[in-house]
Amino acid sequence: MCARTLGKPDFPRLRVRFGKDGRLAYLGHLEVINTVMRSVRRSGLPFSVGNGFAQRMRIQFSQALPVGAASRDEYYDLYLTERRDVTEAFEALKASSPSAMAPLEAAYMTPRLPALEAWLTRSAWEAHLVGTGDGFCASAFDDALRDLREQGVIHFMRGDKPRSIELGTTLVDWSARDAVLEGSWRTIDLTLKTRSSNLGALRPAVLIEAAMGTAALSGTTLDSLRVLRTGQWHEEEDGTLVEALSPELRLG
């Protein structure tokens, strides 16, 4: 159910938090978008469409989750042509969505907020690393990340194109601890806090790959990696973090 927008009124802005189960970790961002849009159409909610020829659904997503990562804190803003009871809307979306991407929370938000992708600039991550080698341990990984931070920039390839990312602002903080041994493998649990900007976003897998190439982890091998995004926030100029579904930003 949809309706073409004729002007620029403040249509109800329904913000939905959803997860991306590990089973769908390798689902790309475009596939996530298409899956959500199909779920919205099946839900029967009166979504708004733009004025362009293609009549695209008016929906905005938070920053793309890297392929290979799961999440329990993704968001989209869906613009409706009429306000429905928030519980009714949430249940309709939940019923029409795959269980591995089911909505977790929903609320109507202030209409004049910036687009999600630009507004949510801080992320928190958990990574579980499994590797081999006597030097594969939390203290060595901590040394590797410290060396990279002092280096300032890491260079990597995305496809066949060289890329670089500056760590001074994008890598906010981290902690590493040794986890339970898994047979002959050693494991590390890593938490990361990152910041994105117009200059780019730091992907955990890129940082971890760069760390494995440092002297601190020489002679070790990373055998498997699981990454989970655990949170996203807006960062104010004074460093205060604002939740995407902050009560202060909700409409009653």
Roles of regions detected by a PLM:
Residues 1-9:
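Charged, low-complexity intrinsically disordered regulatory segments in eukaryotic signaling
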Residues 8-11, 26, 147-252:
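Core RNA-modification/binding signature centered on pseudouridine synthases
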Residues 12, 17-19, 23, 27, ...:
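Extended, well-folded interaction surfaces typified by the phenylalanyl-tRNA synthetase beta subunit core
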Residues 23, 48-80:
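Short, charge-patterned binding micro-sites
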Residues 72-126:
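Ordered, amphipathic secondary-structure segments that act as subunit-interaction surfaces
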Residues 81-86, 132-135, 197:
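Helix N-cap motif at beta-to-alpha junctions
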Residues 88-97, 137-149, 207-208:
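Short amphipathic alpha-helices in soluble, non-transmembrane regions
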